Amino acid sequence: MSEPVNKVKQTQQQVDDVTNTMHIAVGKMLDNQQKVSELTDKSENMKQGAQQFKKKTNEIKRLMWCRNIKLTLIIIAVVVLLLVVIIVPIVLKFT
Amino acid sequence: MSYVPLKQPLLEDDGSFDYEETLLSERNEQAKHLAQDIYHLKGAMDDLKMMVDEQGEMLVQADNNVTTADLEIEYGVEELEKAYVYKSRSKKRIIILVVVILLILAVVIGASIKFFVKK
């Protein structure tokens, strides 16, 4: 007669142990939820920062490229001017 | 003679029945308590599962954000390298420009000197 009572009490004790473990787990998950939320926010901020970094570097590249093109055009114009300055006297001498 | 034997078995049965009834009642209450605790345990497990799923989605989103940030930073670094290359070319072309301008000035000065000498 005492064995079924022990089984019920044993099962009750096991359920109590599991309940305590579940409560501890729920508490940890609540803490983790706050940490995960902060982590998501920080990763979102990092992503936005990376996007801005990408935009800025792209603008810098375009700026440098435009400067490069301008210098190229200026050099071409100056070289043409140099050639003109050299060729005109020669042509004048021949005529 | 027949009355006395009938009385004794009734007393014995009553005592045994009371004990068994008390035992069954206690066991029933314990079983109900056990079922109630298991029900609460199920509720806690459901809550835990919901939180795990939610945090899993948040972690996946965070991982995607980090991956995207990594790719964009790498792309940005490549852009910076290209910008540095263009800047270096610009410096070289500035030097070339200065040299060409000096050549033009030399030619113009030479022509001026010749012109003055002719006078």
Curated annotation (Swiss-Prot), chain A:
It holds the Pfam family Synaptobrevin. Keywords: Coiled coil, Cytoplasmic vesicle, Membrane, Transmembrane, Transmembrane helix. GO terms for cellular component: plasma membrane; SNARE complex; transport vesicle membrane. It is found in: Cytoplasmic vesicle, Secretory vesicle membrane. One of its GO terms (biological process) is vesicle fusion. The chain crosses the membrane at residues 71-91. GO terms for molecular function: SNAP receptor activity; syntaxin binding. PROSITE patterns: V_SNARE. The keyword Coiled coil applies. Involved in the targeting and/or fusion of transport vesicles to their target membrane. This is Synaptobrevin-A.
